[in-house]
């Protein structure tokens, strides 16, 4: 620890004392991996139609990789709202998501309903996820989606104290309902296309999950169809930048 106003500098072992040190919601470089590559960002055409397809509850040991491959087949990117506990299980996948230019966002640490938590538990859900992401890829999420969409003023204030923008969705495919259905992949595909085309048909945020086989299979089919109709698959941040889609407050 150093402070330019101090005449005498002191050194504190952060790893041994991390439970007693507040870092103003920021991690320290020594906790980040040193081999992280710069992300491969996509080129966005502001004049073309866009949809931001978001994937909750990962990373998954195999399906997250498959989802990334699906987006990249069409020069697209996704936004992955990941659980901190899963980031700790699969840090290499988190790192890959970041390096390949997809967006990593927070879905809290263990998918708790935040409106039912006290202030301390709420803070832990946010903080531990930020730390898990930083440890895996050297950066922290700037977007967060509350599990179940559950929010109130206390939850929103906690998000903003970490500099996090809350993102919900325009279309919920309810893909989890079809995870064990024989024709589930086709239903998910149809729902993704429906939600991408709803309202003005340009600039929607669509919700699926990258932890179900049928969801990712449905994603693959939907991307193929939507790409033929001129859609770009962009991150939430790019959607906000180019289409003016505001965060949800």
Task: Please report, for each region that a protein language model flagged, where it lies by residue.
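Residue-level recognition of the N-termini of beta-strands and the immediately preceding loop/turn
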Residues: 140-142, 203-204
């Amino acid at each position: 620890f150093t402070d330019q106003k101090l005449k005498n500098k002191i050194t504190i072992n952060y790893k041994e004392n991390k439970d007693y040190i507040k870092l103003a919601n920021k991690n320290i470089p020594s906790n980040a991996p040193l081999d992280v590559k710069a992300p491969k960002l996509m080129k966005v055409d502001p004049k073309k139609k866009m949809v931001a397809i978001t994937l909750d509850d990962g990373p998954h040991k195999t399906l997250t990789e498959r989802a990334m491959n699906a987006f990249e087949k069409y020069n697209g990117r996704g936004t992955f709202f990941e659980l901190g506990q899963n980031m700790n299980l699969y840090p290499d996948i988190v790192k890959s998501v970041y390096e390949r230019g997809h967006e990593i966002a927070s879905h809290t640490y263990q998918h708790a309903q935040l409106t039912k938590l006290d202030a301390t538990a709420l803070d832990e859900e946010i903080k531990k996820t930020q730390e898990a992401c930083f440890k895996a890829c050297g950066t922290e999420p700037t977007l967060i989606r509350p599990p179940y969409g559950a929010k109130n003023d206390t939850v929103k204030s906690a998000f903003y104290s970490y500099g996090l923008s809350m993102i919900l969705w325009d279309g919920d495919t309810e893909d989890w309902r079809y995870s064990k259905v024989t024709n589930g992949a086709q239903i998910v595909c149809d729902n993704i296309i429906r939600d991408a085309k709803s309202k003005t048909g340009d600039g929607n945020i669509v919700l699926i999950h990258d932890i179900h086989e049928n969801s990712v299979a449905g994603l693959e089919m939907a991307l193929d169809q939507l790409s033929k109709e001129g859609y770009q698959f962009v991150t939430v941040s790019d959607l906000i930048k180019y289409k003016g889609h505001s965060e949800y407050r």
